[in-house]
A protein has these predicted regions:
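Extracellular/periplasmic catalytic domains that process cell-envelope and extracellular macromolecules
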Residues: 55-57, 80-83, 119-124, 175-176
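The feature captures the conserved acid-bearing segment of alpha/beta-hydrolase catalytic domains
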Residues: 86-170
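C-terminal catalytic histidine-bearing segment of alpha/beta-hydrolase fold enzymes
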Residues: 164-206
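Short glycine-enriched nucleophile-adjacent loop
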Residues: 70-81, 198-199
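Short beta-strand immediately N-terminal to the catalytic nucleophile in serine-hydrolase-like folds
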Residues: 63-65
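Serine-hydrolase catalytic machinery in alpha/beta-hydrolase-like enzymes
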Residues: 1-60
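Solvent-exposed loop/turn segments at secondary-structure junctions
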Residues: 5-9, 68-71, 94-97, 133-137, ...
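Phosphate/oxyanion-binding active-site loops and adjacent basic polyanion-contact surfaces
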Residues: 32-43, 103, 155-160, 192
C-alpha cells in the first residue's frame, strides 16, 4: 500500500473508508463526495504514473494491507472492481464492509454506491482474507465495538471468518465463480511483520 498521510487523508473517513462520504459513519446522498475525491481513486493513477516514470510495462499490481490498510484494501476492491489489481491480501482488518444489503454503509452496502454491486465481477477478483490464529483479543487496542459491528464477531479472527464465509455463501447460492481465499496464519497475533511476510508468500510463491 502507498502511504496516506493523516494530514491529507484525515481519520477513518479519509483513509479506512476511502473518503467516499464526508462522514462515512453517517452516509447520505448529500454527503457523498465526487468519485475523483475518493481516496480509492488515487491508486490507479498512481500505478499509471509509476509505470511511466520507470518505463515499466507491468500490466497489473498487487496490494497488501494489514489492519487499517486491510480495511482500505477490501473496500478498494468493492468500489473499484475494474481496477488493474491482480491479487489483494487483506490482513487482520478490525472490521469489514459486509455484503449485507439491509445494513447501512460502512458496515453493509445500504445507502452507498455499493447497493447495486456486481457480485460476478467482485468474486472473480483474487482477494485473500488473512488472519492470525491468535488475533482473537476482543479488547485489542483500537478495535471498534458497537451493536452493529459486533454482529461481525467480537474479535478480528471471528470477523475475518464471518466476512469470508458470508461472501462464499452468496457465491454458492448464486452459483458464481468464487476466487477468494481465507488463510489463517498459524501462531500469529496482530503482528505486522508476521502478516506481511505471510502475505508476500501468498502473492509471490503460491
Amino acid at each position: 500500500m502507498p502511504e496516506f498521510t493523516n494530514s491529507q487523508f484525515p481519520g477513518g473517513d479519509g483513509y479506512n473508508l476511502g473518503n467516499v462520504f464526508i462522514d462515512g459513519d453517517n452516509p447520505s446522498l448529500s454527503t457523498l463526495n465526487p468519485e475523483p475525491e475518493w481516496t480509492f481513486s488515487v491508486i490507479e493513477p498512481l500505478f499509471t504514473y509509476t509505470k511511466q516514470q520507470l518505463n515499466n510495462q507491468t500490466a497489473k499490481y498487487h496490494i497488501i494491507g494489514h489492519s487499517a490498510e486491510a480495511q482500505f484494501a477490501h473496500r478498494f476492491l468493492f468500489f473499484k472492481p475494474e481496477a488493474k489489481v491482480d491479487k489483494i491480501v487483506a490482513s487482520a482488518a478490525g472490521w469489514y464492509t459486509t455484503l449485507e444489503l439491509d445494513i447501512n454503509f460502512p458496515y453493509g452496502l445500504n445507502s452507498s454506491p455499493l447497493e447495486n454491486m456486481d457480485y460476478t465481477q467482485l468474486f472473480s477478483n483474487h482477494l485473500t482474507v488473512l488472519i492470525g490464529s491468535n488475533d482473537n483479543d476482543p479488547n485489542s487496542s483500537s478495535l471498534r465495538h458497537n451493536s452493529i459491528v459486533d454482529l461481525q464477531g467480537l474479535n478480528r479472527l471471528e470477523r475475518a471468518s464471518n466476512f469470508y464465509t458470508n461472501a462464499q455463501s452468496i457465491a454458492v447460492n448464486q452459483e458464481l465463480n468464487f476466487e477468494w481465499n481465507y488463510v489463517i496464519n498459524p501462531n500469529a497475533d496482530h503482528n505486522y511483520l508476521l502478516a506481511v511476510s505471510k502475505a508476500a508468500d501468498l502473492i509471490f510463491n503460491q
